Regions:
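Solvent-exposed alpha-helical segments and adjacent loops
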Residues: 1-220
Length: 220
């Protein structure tokens, strides 16, 4: 990422009401409850920006966080951007829709998957929300991608999993040099000068993600 602007992380934000516990400065054991409107971020979407920001700092890059709900196309046209999260981030869905690997779901939004345009109708990388909620143990899938987005003429980086644990695993993959070296077994030698999209899979056990594995790669 060579642009001079701070690199934006576009991350999903959720508005809602919550109860906040406030403690007395003179007596921290004394507390009161306050109901307030909050903007919250999914905890699974937090670790990737933290890890990637560490890499950016090594290369002397600055960054900023943009809430998905208020991010505009004008802002994204200023330079490369990083998009965190899938079904809670409309920009991720919008930018990945034309790609070979993209996110999809059934009308009831109970099943979510990554679809391959080369094999339409095949739902190999699918997650059933019912299974996820009942057991906490399931296979999860994610997309990691880097490409020139035609809407902005800038590089877009996607770090997005279907459900809890997926986005975190994608972020782990992106900052792990050993895992990035695995890409060389799946791509041509000049892949670093091309657009690339990777499908990852990870085993979730009791809500915790295992190591990410490469399921498919597309370079163009």
């Amino acid at each position: 990422m060579n642009a001079g602007e701070p690199v934006p992380f576009c991350i999903a934000d959720q508005n809602g009401y919550s109860t906040i516990k406030l403690r007395d400065a003179a007596d921290p054991q004394h507390e009161t409850l306050l109901t307030d409107s909050l903007v919250t971020v999914n905890i699974d979407d937090v670790s990737p920006p933290i890890n990637i920001a560490g890499l950016l700092r090594i290369y002397g890059k600055t960054y900023r966080v943009l809430p998905e709900a208020t991010t505009s196309l004008t802002e994204l046209r200023r330079g490369p951007s990083i998009f965190i999260g899938a079904f809670d981030n409309s920009w991720t869905l919008r930018l990945t829709t034309p790609l070979r690997f993209h996110f999809a779901n059934n009308p009831d939004m109970t099943q979510f998957w990554i679809e391959d345009r080369a094999q339409l109708g095949k739902q190999e990388w699918m997650l059933d929300r019912g299974v996820q909620q009942r057991t906490g143990t399931y296979k999860n899938y994610a997309i990691v991608a880097r490409f020139i987005d035609p809407n902005t003429d800038q590089f877009a980086v996607i770090v997005a999993g279907i459900a809890r644990g997926g986005t975190g695993a994608a972020g782990e993959f992106l900052v792990d040099a050993n895992r990035l070296n695995e890409i060389a077994n799946h791509v041509p030698k000049d892949w670093n000068r091309k657009n690339i999209e990777i499908v990852l899979e990870t085993q979730i056990i009791e809500g915790r993600s295992g190591p990410p594995r490469i399921a498919a790669v597309h370079v163009w």
